[in-house]
Amino acid sequence: MQFMFKKRDNIKEVEEGKYLSPKFDENGLIPVITTDFQTGNLLMHGYMNYEALKKTIETKEVHYWSRSRKKLWRKGQISGFVQIVKEIRIDDDQDSVWLSVDIGNGASCHVGYRSCFYRSIPLGKIKNEEELEIGRASCRERV
């Protein structure tokens, strides 16, 4: 496989250099946080492999690696909820990606919510761990 990304030579180059040198984990994945370009709201968390990151950069449409299906997928391929990239950032260690995307009037979550984080976990004393009820988050908006 020919890499389009620079080899990670030293920490100074990774943290302060001008070249993309993403660090994929032992499974060949890098975590991705995706937010709404218009609102800044958190939409989802996913993973990319080398091919998904490359395709996302080249096409401006988000591609993820599905850990459950073990295959590359273009967001919206089945649901129609496409994510168009407005900006890509990488953290200081280059081991985590942040996507800022346009989802139009669509959803991000495959079950139809704008955000995959549509449920809220209550804070305070836990009475029964097996029956801790989760509530509706303030961002709960179904498309």
Please describe what each predicted stretch is.
Residues 133-143:
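Residue-level detector of conserved catalytic or cofactor/ligand-binding positions
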Residues 50-66:
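A short, polar/charged loop-to-alpha-helix boundary motif
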Residues 2-27:
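Short, basic/aromatic recognition patches
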